[in-house]
């Protein structure tokens, strides 16, 4: 199970499985034959340089909407960033999903906020290395990549996810002081 909350299929299959593997320690009930394996993360993400932002340059803000794009992030962030004094405003790279690309670019333009808006980011290791702060959903693999890259984050879980697994994923980092759960 890749999430902090066991999904329906894995919950059903766990009854007949000889061993249960979990990406987040404690997903399966204690006493079950479980192995905390973690989730797979590419080596280049583990090799992300240590964060060294000292305030002498604009903050680098990476916004990740996931593969489908998170419409609330696409709409709210440009308007929120517009309220920041332009001299203090971060540099923004926003991954918004293919279907939201034009709308997200338009939202930044209307807000008067400069941003590099992309449908997809192929080099996630490079994106994490560039970022000082990440705002994103809380899918299991994204949360694990953030932990591996050592990047602080504001996590905005998908509100209608089955079993609210994204909130549990986000809480895993937030409870350890590695993220803020929104």
Task: Please place each PLM-identified region on the residue numbering.
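Active-site-proximal region of nucleotide-activated glycan assembly enzymes
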Residues: 1-48
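Short, glycine/polar-rich helix-capping loops at beta-to-alpha or helix-loop-helix junctions
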Residues: 5-10, 23-30, 103, 142-143, ...
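Short glycine-/small-residue-rich Rossmann-like dinucleotide-binding loops
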Residues: 25, 66, 97, 139-140, ...
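Donor-nucleotide binding loops and adjacent catalytic segments primarily
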Residues: 53-134, 166-171, 175, 182
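A short structural motif in glycosyltransferase catalytic domains
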Residues: 118, 137, 155-156
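Catalytic binding pocket for nucleotide-activated donors in carbohydrate/polymer assembly enzymes
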Residues: 148-182
